[in-house]
UniProtKB/Swiss-Prot annotation:
Keyword Repeat on entry: no
Subcellular compartments: Membrane
Gene name for this UniProt entry: MSL7
UniProt cross-references to Gene3D superfamilies, sorted A to Z: 2.30.30.60
Main location: membrane
GO terms for cellular component: membrane
UniProt KW Transmembrane keyword: yes
Name of the protein in question: Mechanosensitive ion channel protein 7
A Pfam short name: MS_channel_2nd
Biological process annotations from GO: monoatomic ion transmembrane transport
UniProt cross-references to SUPFAM superfamilies, sorted A to Z: Sm-like ribonucleoproteins
Annotated segments matching region Disordered: 1-49
């Protein structure tokens, strides 16, 4: 079968697949497509299989139970993809053998009807092992065609299986890697990642607002810089021109100046129409002028401009209604009201006031929600987003070619060519070999010039966010626009290697270019290690990183790997652990941002509902619709609603405070609540879903969590641990001192795991015969990754056992002294005659018994 190679690039700088290889693969595929039924049967019997939709569909049943039985670290994938061709071939054979043993079975029921028309009917149940969709579908079609020719009816019973699959799919956890077949099936749903090449953060032109940090409009997306000209705007401009011309003619011409309509001058009606129709257009121009002056001020542009654009429409409506109210008040004054003797003008004035107050309240509501949401996101997630994007940049940079080294080599070649050109221009006689070496021929079209290849898709004049700008950002100077863009990158862009851009022009599956599971993260780690490390070496050194990164970035990268800062080298296991942890953190952060966005939207809807109720009350009061009796009735209803839903409203309010203000955890955090360790699966306003060690989902109300002590492992610093062992009280002090010294030496020899100078003390004495020795040490990690913690703890326990055995310290009972006093005389007819005469013999017999 075809084996997925997630991170192989046909156009990478290390390996180029020729056209002949592609043609050969195409011929093989054509041969497979032309197989007849006999060949298919042979293929099934030989154990080979194809990669088809049916196989993927039914294999979900087998993988689902195994997924649910995973431990808290979710190690559902025990096999790892290797990137070497030989290793891939071996693993392919193993996988095909396993598939033949555990192939999914599909039950088909056939009811045979006699062609002679009799009522005799025989049913047969047949089970076929379908290893591929191609083979099973072909056999099914041939069999059904044969049955139809014989007059038989085929009945398929598949409703139960579909229902089971749907229920299982709903019960999966977001923190557990999906099955490999599901990843292939739904890979098109996940957007591809734009590259971070040359220190630029990638972005989607459709989903993520762009910005240019070097210009004065760095915090304004492109969509806000462009003037929108739609049909309504065009109609407003035409109406503005027509009404201005009519107003000028009405005031300039004597015959039109005294013209009246409904006892009012014509120019007053023109002014009212001008304000009503074109007032919003004029207020929009005023908003643009205000925004222009705000953009000129750096501080205001950083801190205020986002909120100005957020409430731009509400402010524009406020100005528009304010202009309408002013025009109505000054044009239709009390004199006009007395002349007309109508209540319509007063009613219209009240309606305009109600509209203005409603718009102002809506403006305040929108501004408050945006300010609170922005401050919450910056204070809570900025540091994690900054770290996650830097990890993304490292993954894509280290998986690609050494651009810094290639650029230095190319600069040296350019200087050499310039010198040779100057020498030739000066009349120097140079050998053809030197000229051919200095001016190499152009590479073939199949190769790829990595420097001039279109790595980063650009739109307009946007250049993205450089890593230097990202490092300079902090919670105080980051703008709301940048924070919004960074959040969208984390939510929408998945981790990927640099092969993704190199494969844009190939026909390889798009799903092979991303890191969507821990299995693919380990495969990417092996690829990065082979790409960065020198041939034949087992470690990555600082000099190797400097081929890809700048000096400051390389030094910062060395601090990310366990033990690299002390040993000055990066092992393959350390690189794999870092990449897996980076993938887990990125996935948890994306889920956290999605849940937070959903919670903020729900909160916004709640506040909008309350604001709408307040606006309705204001309308009723200003329009004098609510009389005293009506207000008394409303008050009684409010009291009744408060009695019925008061506790619910209190719960919602306290849950909002717990989630947004206290905020004790995020998605993916490991917590200890009531002596039970759980991982946060999903956050909502009213509830939180947890995942226990056995993958059991537990739903806690947030109001209940507010009253409990929450121990958060993920937010804790490097945590300590305790390991105890017991020796007998008769153990010599020299051996106890040797135990302390050897345990301390072992801990100091593992600087990548623990901090040095651990405490080894005699903790307690039990029953005057057991001495308890305690080892207090501090890990260089917290206990968020509980599997890694117990792995390191197991290494220490094994070393302690080894030390105790080498020092001949074992657990055994030492002899005890027993003092037997004078025993009472035994009165019995069954006592031997010598028993009462010899008490020493009696003691010996009792002791032996």
């Amino acid at each position: 079968m075809e084996f997925r190679k997630p991170f192989k690039s046909h156009s990478s700088y290390k390996q180029i697949i020729s056209t002949g290889d592609q043609n050969e693969k195409t011929k093989k595929k054509k041969k497979l497509a032309n197989l007849d039924d006999g060949d298919i049967a042979k293929t099934q019997s030989s154990g080979s299989s194809f990669d088809g939709n049916s196989y993927k569909f039914w294999q979900d049943i087998a993988t689902d139970d195994y997924t649910k039985s995973g431990s808290f670290d979710f190690p559902q994938y025990r096999e790892e993809i290797t990137l070497d061709v030989n290793e891939e071939t071996e693993e392919t054979e193993d996988v095909s053998n396993n598939n033949n043993l555990s192939g999914s079975k599909e039950t088909r029921v056939f009811f045979k009807i006699n062609s002679s028309g009799t009522n005799n009917m025989s049913g047969s149940v047949r089970s076929c092992t379908s290893s591929t969709s191609f083979s099973s579908a072909t056999m099914r079609l041939n069999l059904e065609q044969q049955l139809e020719d014989e007059g038989e009816v085929v009945v398929r019973c598949s409703s139960v299986r579909k229902t089971e699959l749907v229920s299982r799919a709903k019960a999966r956890s977001r923190l557990i890697d999906p099955p490999q077949e599901e990843e292939q099936q739904y890979s098109s749903w996940i957007g591809t990642s734009d590259q971070l090449r040359s220190g630029l953060l990638g972005r989607h032109s459709d989903d993520i607002e762009e910005e240019d940090d070097s210009s004065a409009e760095e915090d304004v997306p492109v969509e806000y810089r462009k003037l929108k000209m739609d049909a309504i705007t065009l109609l407003q401009w035409m109406s503005l021109i027509a009404l201005v011309v009519a107003l000028v003619l009405s005031l300039g011409l004597h015959t039109w100046r005294n013209a009246t309509l409904w006892s009012l001058h014509l120019w007053k009606w023109e002014v009212v129409l001008l304000v009503l129709i074109c007032g919003r257009l004029v207020s929009g121009c005023g908003i643009r002028i205000i925004v222009f002056f705000i953009e000129r001020n750096f501080l205001l542009r950083k801190r205020v401009l986002y909120f100005v654009y957020g409430v731009k429409t509400a402010v524009q409506n406020c100005l528009w209604l304010g202009l309408v109210l002013l025009a109505w008040h000054f044009l239709f004054d009390k004199k006009v009201e007395k002349e007309t003797q109508s209540d319509v003008l007063l009613l219209m004035s009240k309606i305009l006031v109600c509209f203005l107050l409603s718009t102002v309240l809506w403006l305040i509501k929108t501004l408050v929600v945006k300010v609170l949401a922005s401050s919450f996101h910056v204070s809570t997630y900025f540091d994690r987003i900054q770290e996650a994007l830097f990890h993304h940049y490292l993954i894509e940079t280290l998986s690609g070619p050494p651009m810094l080294e290639l650029s230095r080599i190319e600069e040296e070649e350019d200087r050499t060519q310039d010198e040779i050109y100057k020498m030739q221009k000066g009349g120097a006689d140079l050998s053809p070999e030197l000229c051919s070496a200095a001016f190499p021929q152009e590479k073939s079209g199949s190769t790829m010039n990595m420097k001039f290849s279109p790595i980063i898709p650009k739109t307009g004049s946007d250049n993205g966010i450089t890593m230097d700008d990202l490092h300079k950002m902090n919670q105080k100077n980051v703008s709301a626009w940048n924070m919004k863009r960074l959040m969208k990158i984390v939510r929408n862009v998945s981790l990927s290697t640099l092969d993704e851009q190199a494969l844009q022009n190939t026909c390889e599956d798009e799903s092979t270019r991303q890191i969507r599971s821990e299995k693919e993260a380990k495969a990417a780690a092996r690829k990065i290690f082979k790409n960065v490390a020198q041939p034949g070496t087992k470690h990555i050194y600082l000099e190797d990183l400097m081929r890809f990164l700048r000096v400051d970035e390389a030094m910062k990268t060395m601090c990310l790997f366990e033990g690299a800062l002390v040993t000055k080298k990066i092992t393959k296991s350390a690189l794999k652990n870092w990449l897996v942890n980076a993938f887990r953190e990125r996935r948890a952060l994306a889920l956290t941002l999605n849940d937070t966005k959903t919670a903020v939207n729900k909160l916004h809807h709640m506040i909008s509902f309350l604001t709408a109720i307040v606006i309705i009350v204001i309308w009723l009061i200003l329009l004098e619709i609510a009389t005293s009796k009506y207000l008394l009735f409303l008050t009684s209803q409010v009291v009744l609603l408060a009695f019925m839903f008061g506790n619910s409203l209190k719960t919602v309010f306290e849950s909002i405070i717990f989630l947004f203000i206290i905020h004790p955890y995020d998605v993916g955090d490991r917590l200890l609540i009531d002596t039970v360790e759980m991982v946060v699966e999903e956050m909502n306003i009213l509830t939180t879903v947890f995942l226990r060690a056995d993958n059991l989902k537990i739903v806690y109300p947030n109001i209940l969590l507010w009253q409990k002590a929450i121990h958060n492992y993920n937010r804790s610093p490097d945590m300590g641990d305790e390991v105890t062992c017991c020796v007998h009280i008769t153990t010599p002090p020299e051996k106890i001192a040797a135990i302390k010294q050897r345990i301390s030496s072992y801990i100091d020899s593992k600087p990548e795991y623990w901090y040095p100078k651990a405490d080894v003390i005699v903790k307690d004495v039990e029953d005057l015969n057991i001495v308890r020795i305690a080892i207090w040490l501090c890990h260089k990690i917290n206990h968020q990754n509980m599997g890694e913690r117990f792995t390191r703890r197991a290494l220490l326990i094994e070393e302690v056992i080894k030390i105790l055995l080498e020092l001949d310290i074992q657990y055994r009972f030492h002899p005890l002294d027993i003092n037997v006093k004078t025993m009472p005389t035994v009165v019995s007819s069954r006592v031997p005659p010598a028993w009462s005469q010899n008490p020493d013999l009696r003691r010996i017999i009792l002791l032996e018994c």
